[in-house]
Amino acid sequence: MTLRARGARLLGGLLFFTLLAAGAAPLSWDLPEPRSRAGKIRVHPRGNLWATGHFMGKKSLEPPNPSLLGTTHHISLRDQRLQLSHDLLRILLQKKALGLSLSGPASHTPYRRLLVQTLEK
């Protein structure tokens, strides 16, 4: 083979290899981003939790309203006694309606009688 044939064959192989490599490469020419400090930030898959709770609450520039600070109802001692007496009256009326004795601790006397009668048989 002559020198000219070898050169043509080498040139053809090189051209074939170039076309093969160009076909395997992506069709768009993506230029790499310039290296800067922004490119060196590590991103964690779960996200960066550094400032998670920083902006959680509402930030307000106005001073808080004093009427909103005391939103809990302060019940006086007299109101508490009145509420307790109403609750006691309601409980006593329920016990009377059910036929339970009003004196003494709440016992299961009607059920106890039934249980004793059942066990004696």
From Swiss-Prot:
Tissue specificity remark: Higher expression in the central nervous system (CNS) than in peripheral tissues. Highest levels are found in the olfactory bulb. Relatively high levels in the CNS (including the cerebral cortex, cerebellum, spinal cord, medulla oblongata, midbrain, hypothalamus, hippocampus, and hypophysis) and in peripheral tissues such as the pancreas, adrenal gland, testis, ovary and cecum. Moderate levels are found in the rectum, heart and pons with low expression levels detected in the bone marrow and duodenum. Other tissues show no or low levels of expression.
Taxonomic lineage from the root: Eukaryota, Metazoa, Chordata, Craniata, Vertebrata
UniProt-listed GO biological process terms: antiviral innate immune response; Leydig cell proliferation; negative regulation of interleukin-6 production; neuropeptide signaling pathway; positive regulation of hormone secretion; positive regulation of interferon-alpha production; positive regulation of osteoclast proliferation; positive regulation of respiratory gaseous exchange
Organism listed in the record: Sus scrofa
Propeptide boundaries: 60-121
Protein's UniProt keywords contain Signal: yes
Residues annotated with Methionine amide modification: 56
Designated gene of the protein: NMB
Described function: Stimulates smooth muscle contraction. Induces sighing by acting directly on the pre-Botzinger complex, a cluster of several thousand neurons in the ventrolateral medulla responsible for inspiration during respiratory activity. Contributes to the induction of sneezing following exposure to chemical irritants or allergens which causes release of NMB by nasal sensory neurons and activation of NMBR-expressing neurons in the sneeze-evoking region of the brainstem. These in turn activate neurons of the caudal ventral respiratory group, giving rise to the sneezing response.
GO terms assigned for molecular function: neuromedin B receptor binding; neuropeptide hormone activity
Subcellular location: Secreted; Cell projection, Neuron projection
Annotated GO CC locations: extracellular space; neuron projection
Alphabetical UniProt keywords: Amidation, Cell projection, Cleavage on pair of basic residues, Immunity, Innate immunity, Secreted, Signal
Signal peptide: 1-24
Keyword flag Magnesium: no
The protein's name in its UniProt record: Neuromedin-B
Coiled-coil segments on the chain, per record: none
Main location: secreted
Family of the protein in this entry: Belongs to the bombesin/neuromedin-B/ranatensin family.
